[in-house]
Amino acid sequence: SSYVEMNNKVVKLTDELKEKVLNTVNDLNAEGMRVIGVAQKNNIEDIIEFGVKDEKDMVLIGYIAFLDPPKESAAEAIRELIKYGVDVKILTGDNDSVTKKVCKEVGLDVNYILLGNNVDIMSDEELSIAVDETNVFAKLSPLQKSRIIKVLKEKGHVVGFMGDGINDAAALKEADVGISVDTGVDIAKESADIILLEKSLMVLVDGVKEGRSCLL
């Protein structure tokens, strides 16, 4: 956006106002909310068909902030998985502020957050070291998620990945065990090996225990 609406007036989006906008977004992110900016284009009388080229000189009119809280069973499931020796890692496209808040809510200690732009510039050897030292990865693209899982597998880990969105499809396919939920998007469910029908994530713990008992 090039302009912002304030007090029913459209004014230029100056550096000072832009900083205020970003501060508001950061505050909302810190509360675990994802934020979408809403802008409109004024003076459109002469435009018959709209295209990407028209998405400029727009007026910021507000935000949409929405919360996607973790499942109530998430914290207990993570504790139990760790107790059974499962190394729990977060791979997400969300930014680091939202991710920190969610990790705090589920009781997962964050020792370090590795961002997608840093993953991109790492060699496979560097990433191989980083995946052992890092338990939270944020702002990841679908291919970056898949690459991290591939590196973990190459290090000898058996990797399970749980996801329910379009951006999780590649990672679900790459993992040794791809896990989705019955409310996930079609491509995620099609890419998964297992689809959870129960709402409680404790079923993951039950699966680990049952799988190990089969090997005894």
What are these regions (language model features)?
Residues E125-S128, K153, K173, T183-L216:
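Non-transmembrane, extramembrane segments of multi-pass ion/lipid transporters
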Residues F137, G178-S180, I194-I195:
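Short, well-ordered beta-strand core segments
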Residues S1-I166, K173-E174:
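Cytosolic catalytic headpiece
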